[in-house]
């Protein structure tokens, strides 16, 4: 009786059946597919049956830091792809640090991509951890991988796509990825007929002045870029995706965000300033800029759930002094991220959300600016707000107390306001706590919960 047959009845020291040993090889390989390759290889010491089983796992998930020598890493990938070369490959995940001394050899990646395309790979995830060298240009064969479902690339350069056939591609993440020409990205997006999720993280030097995202199937779009106030550019992002449900924008450099036929967005995460800054300030006389901001706000006005940053609120506040804001009638959940800006622009936006039920104030960093804390003029009641949570620990500063007062004194049906005190403030016999609890409340059923 061989060792596997001896082990299959019961686990050591237990009365439970060892079901793992009863599983067929094909199912074990599917289980191992979910582990990093370095851990999969370790199973080879379990028994004779497991000795070569890892070689049949239909996927590779490897980091060059798993190897002491970079050449060993390269040889391992070569050997793995050569073994059982006629079988299909479900995933190919590779992370490497492309140092200068390895440059000649790292171009093997192009050959590996050609190989896995012929093996009908479904998921490609390649990360150049040197982050921004763009040494490696992937071959054009990647554009004709008809089995490909997800493509995630970081720090690489893509060839200009002359022909694209990606009928199965649903997810594409391009992180600090460059194209051989400025039309390459637009062409690639347009030629993916079932693309549902697109994430683009841009570098300050990608040289794409106008990025057009045109997709009839896209449901989720994320656009992120590093911020550099010293860069004054007329960059444009134009989005034409009528089925879009989720939108995340985090880019202070782009001057114009254009939403064409936005459909009905459900959720958005917005941190943009339309390239406005302390140097390049909002100009009420710049009518094209005002029109663009107005159309953008109208485009996102259908959302139900939104995260918005104080930098964006400041632009909205400046815009509101020229024009009336559109109503966000569907918005029921709002999370506001404050970073170093006064909250005085918040009431203006809240009053444009007539059906808002939940407000979360996160990471607020309040600033004192004299006594002019509340916006001048009468404020409208918040007739729908039911729940408020202030996540930043309060210290009792005037700005904080004004925020709490505004919410309690203007919310007609507020049920609960949750906050917490800073560790430097003792809850017992706290003057701040007494002040908070003494604030008049418009809603008779509201509770203040101090965590």
Curated annotation (Swiss-Prot):
Superkingdom of origin organism: Eukaryota
> F-box domain location, by residue?
17-70
Tell me one Pfam family matched here: LRR_At5g56370
UniProt domain FBD: residue ranges: 370-421
Q: Which UniProt keywords apply?
A: Leucine-rich repeat, Repeat
LRR repeats mapped onto the chain:
128-155, 177-202, 224-251, 335-363
UniProt xrefs under PANTHER family: F-BOX/RNI SUPERFAMILY PROTEIN-RELATED (PTHR31900), PROTEIN WITH RNI-LIKE_FBD-LIKE DOMAIN (PTHR31900:SF33)
* Name of the protein in question: F-box/LRR-repeat protein 13
Q: Which gene encodes it?
A: FBL13
């Amino acid at each position: 009786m061989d060792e596997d047959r001896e082990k299959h009845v019961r686990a050591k020291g237990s009365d439970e059946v060892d079901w793992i040993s009863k599983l067929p090889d094909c199912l074990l390989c599917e289980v191992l597919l979910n582990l990093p390759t370095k851990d999969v290889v370790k199973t080879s010491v379990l028994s004779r049956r497991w000795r070569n089983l890892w070689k049949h796992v239909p996927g590779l998930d490897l980091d060059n830091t798993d190897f002491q020598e970079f050449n060993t890493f390269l040889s391992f990938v070569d050997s793995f792809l050569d073994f059982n070369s006629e079988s299909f490959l479900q995933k190919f995940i590779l992370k490497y640090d492309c140092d200068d001394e390895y440059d000649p050899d790292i171009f093997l990646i192009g050959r590996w991509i050609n190989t896995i395309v012929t093996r009908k790979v479904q998921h490609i995830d390649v990360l150049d951890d040197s982050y921004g060298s763009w040494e490696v240009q992937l071959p054009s064969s990647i554009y004709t991988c008809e089995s490909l479902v997800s493509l995630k690339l970081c720090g690489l350069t893509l060839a200009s796509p002359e022909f694209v056939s990606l009928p199965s591609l649903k997810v594409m993440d391009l992180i600090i990825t460059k194209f051989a020409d400025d039309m390459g990205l637009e062409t690639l997006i347009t030629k993916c007929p079932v693309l549902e999720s697109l994430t683009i993280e841009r570098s300050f030097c990608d040289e794409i002045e106008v990025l057009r995202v045109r997709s009839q199937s896209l449901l989720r779009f994320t656009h992120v870029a590093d911020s550099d106030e010293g860069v004054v550019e007329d960059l444009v992002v134009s989005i034409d995706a009528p089925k879009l449900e989720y939108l995340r924008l985090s880019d202070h450099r782009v001057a114009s965000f254009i939403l064409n036929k936005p459909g009905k967005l459900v959720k958005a995460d917005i941190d943009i300033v339309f390239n406005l800054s302390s140097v390049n300030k909002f100009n009420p006389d710049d009518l094209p800029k005002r029109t663009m901001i107005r159309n953008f706000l109208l485009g996102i006005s259908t959302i139900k759930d939104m995260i918005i940053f104080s930098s964006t609120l400041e632009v909205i506040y400046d815009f509101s002094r020229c024009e009336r804001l559109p109503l966000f009638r569907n918005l029921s959940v709002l999370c506001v991220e404050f970073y170093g800006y006064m909250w005085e622009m918040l009431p203006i936006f809240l009053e444009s959300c007539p059906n808002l039920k939940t407000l979360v104030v996160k990471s607020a960093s309040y600033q004192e600016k004299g006594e002019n804390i509340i916006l001048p003029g009468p404020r409208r009641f918040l007739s729908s707000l039911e729940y408020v949570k202030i996540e930043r620990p309060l210290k009792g500063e005037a700005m904080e107390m004004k925020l709490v007062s505004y919410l309690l004194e203007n919310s007609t049906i507020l049920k609960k306001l949750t906050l917490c005190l800073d560790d430097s403030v003792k809850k017992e016999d706290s003057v701040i706590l007494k002040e908070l609890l003494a604030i008049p409340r418009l809603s008779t059923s509201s509770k203040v919960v101090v965590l």
